[in-house]
Design a protein with these regions (language model features):
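Extended beta-strand-rich architecture
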Residues: 1, 11-201
């Protein structure tokens, strides 16, 4: 799935036991789909997985330092995937597949209590018309959607998983609640009953 994200190849680097070079990807989505396929090959029918890690994007404005590599931005991302039945098997509940709105609810819960907006978008990993940019406070913080049919076919998946990827930094941004002092006077409640003529409107 590296083809859908501008992968950056590391010179003279390979995985243990593999001759192929390591690529620094700009998204975690591909690795989640790889894990899904492994689980399906072991007969798992309901899969929920997540990953936290750095992605790599070319950015000429980034300079060399003790924590950065010149020309590359390395933000931390949180990505997750849901596949299969929406709910665990139980009596009296009909089975249905997880969908866009189930994962949308997960994203809203993850970012609560902030208000989250979902804006229709296009992304090479996701199904056209079933993809959205995730916004908090008017700024893009991630993307979510159903896996593109092209990738579903390439990975030979019986059905499409739903995924999201968020900027990890937004998860640590918390609005500090404001407090007010307790009122000196207690509130008072009174029940009133009024008797009026029927002709009164």
């Amino acid at each position: 799935m590296a083809a859908m994200s501008a992968a950056t190849e590391i010179a003279n680097a390979s995985r243990s036991g593999e001759s192929a070079p390591i690529s620094c990807l700009s998204t975690l989505i591909g690795s989640l789909v790889d894990v899904l396929r492994t689980n399906l090959s072991r007969k798992a029918d309901r899969v929920r997985i997540f990953e936290v890690g750095r992605v790599f994007k070319r950015d000429p404005s980034v300079l060399d330092s003790d924590q950065t590599v010149g020309g590359f931005d390395q933000p931390v991302r949180v990505s997750a995937l849901a596949y299969g039945p929406a709910d665990a098997q139980q009596w009296g509940v009909s089975s249905r597949s997880v969908d866009f709105f189930d994962v949308k609810g997960d994203v809203e819960a993850l970012l609560a209590p902030r208000t989250v907006a979902f804006v229709p978008a296009e992304h090479p990993a996701f199904h056209p018309g079933r993809c959205a940019r995730v916004q908090v406070g008017g700024r893009d913080v991630g993307v979510m959607g159903e896996l593109h049919p092209k990738w579903r076919q390439a990975y030979d998946l019986p059905q499409a998983p739903v995924l999201f990827e968020l900027d990890a930094a937004v998860l640590t941004e918390r609005v500090v609640p404001s407090f007010t002092s307790v009122p000196r006077m207690q509130s008072v409640f009174r029940d009133l009953a009024l008797v009026v003529k029927d002709s009164t409107s």
